[in-house]
Amino acid sequence: MIHCLADNIHSPFGNTTADNFAVLRRGAQRPTLHCLPGVPEPLCAALWPEGAIEARYAALYGAAEGLSRFEQLALLSIRAALAQTELDVSAPDCLLLLSTTKANVRWLAAAPESFVPRTGTLGETAAVIARHAGFSTVPVVVSNACISGAHALLLAARLLRQKAYRHVVVCGVDEQSPFIAAGFQSFRALSLAPCRPFDAARDGLNLGEAAATLVLSSAAPRRTVETPRAALDWCLVSGAVRNDANHISGPSRTGEGAFRALRATLPPDVSRLAFVSAHGTATPYNDEMESRALSRAALSALPVAAYKGLFGHTMGAAGVLETLLSFRAVEAGCVPPVQGFAQLGVTCPVSVSAVERPTHRRELVKMLSGFGGCNAALHFAPAPDVADAPRGFIERNWTPVAEVRLTSATCSVDGEILPLSATGEALLAAIYAEFIGGYPKFHKMDPLSRLGFVASELLLAAVRRKGHCLDENTAVVLVGHSGSQAADTRFQHTIADPDNYYPSPAVFVYTLPNIATGEIAIRNGFHGETAYFALPAFEANRVRHLVCTAGTDPETTALVGGWIECPTADRFEAHLHCYLPQAPSLRP
């Protein structure tokens, strides 16, 4: 079993999970209007007062030692959760998983040209946090848009089931900045009033910032006198990630990926579920999509909880924060109120209420969806109600059947070097024109997505030449270091000058590194798992291990993935493989 040992939420509404849940039940607070420096329009959001995070960190731990605001926030939550345990996180069987979408992206504003500080990349940021928290193992970043937190919990469970680690600390964290606010405003996705999930009058989301930490373990928790009497021994029973294969920024009209994730995750007896914790962004299309997915999964009558009417969209923190609030709700015997809801405004009926409802049931499902077409679902239940055998998990060996190596100067497929007519920034376009073609969307992609697209096209062509046919259950997993750094720098240029302020949604959407996986899924009709992970540095064995974690999903039929790094348009490398499950050996 995968047990949840300890947890914490740091948000503008409280510094413990209990405090935040109490605010949620009271329903007296909502996001408020804020003006961010350099952003012409105000935004309604759940944000800390200026300097509050730094002041709390200094009061508890002294000098911040050059840590960014983002890093201090993550450490506040991680240390608060670990203080509830007796774990020695310096042990080799402990791992930190950091779930975030943009991490230290605000640091780009100080140097929007070619220089990015040491904490400007995902991998380096995680290394700094892990070192200050006391970990000796190398951390992993999950940066998979809005589902990052849920995907990090699923990855943690898989690593624990594989016995790669004994304890995994998952911290979901994001802060708001002019970069993020400008991007969402460019999509016209923000409401100027407190948001209204699933309501007929909903007109957009609110942004929020938070850090939420959950300590998972293959060992059962030790109850102490400080353990709340109502606390349950929560276990992550099953989970899945599926792609819409539809659009990089718009949800599927049929809720395809969300439905597939639910179908792979739901328990055999859904009558045991207290409620489903929905993504509930309060945008017209997302809430409509979720209602369709719930209807297709025959869950229209199941109570729905949605938390963004209070906390806003906390992005990389959302999956962990909303899971923890759901734990507390089940322990309190209630379905939390959906703040901002008044009248149902989605096509397919779902059970949403603005008032708290009682429940005696003890299991729950968490849903999330995000840019890049990704969707996640997780099923949690208390330990006494969980069978020892995990659902949705299988151990298999995976064999590489094709390989592509691509840098800004060379390209090889299965060891055979391709003749190239260009190098540097012009190389990807040249390979596309000479060997691929026929896909105009290529020309609008950012450098990272172009690199992933070209490398995957060459790889899949080699796979087909060998007689293999990949189906829709193929997973795509990319691992890098600096994420979408090239796109981040480009978008920062569009908002740096107040007199020449022109944030573009077509540029902003590519500031999420998992978009590269979405482009590959859309091109090939892959509905399997898609993910982007980051490491502080390249390690071949770890990259392969992370890619193959998607192969523990019983529905995965093939894996496409590997290392991909593109800090600038003219400096890049990709080393991808296609893996197929190894046929079991026949016994004599």
Please tell me what each predicted stretch does.
Residues 1-139, 158, 177, 183-206, ...:
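Conserved "HGTGT" condensation-loop signature of ketosynthase/thiolase-family condensing enzymes
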Residues 141-143:
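Compositionally biased, intrinsically disordered linkers/stalks adjacent to structured regions
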Residues 174:
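Glycine-/small-residue-rich beta->alpha transition segments that form the dinucleotide
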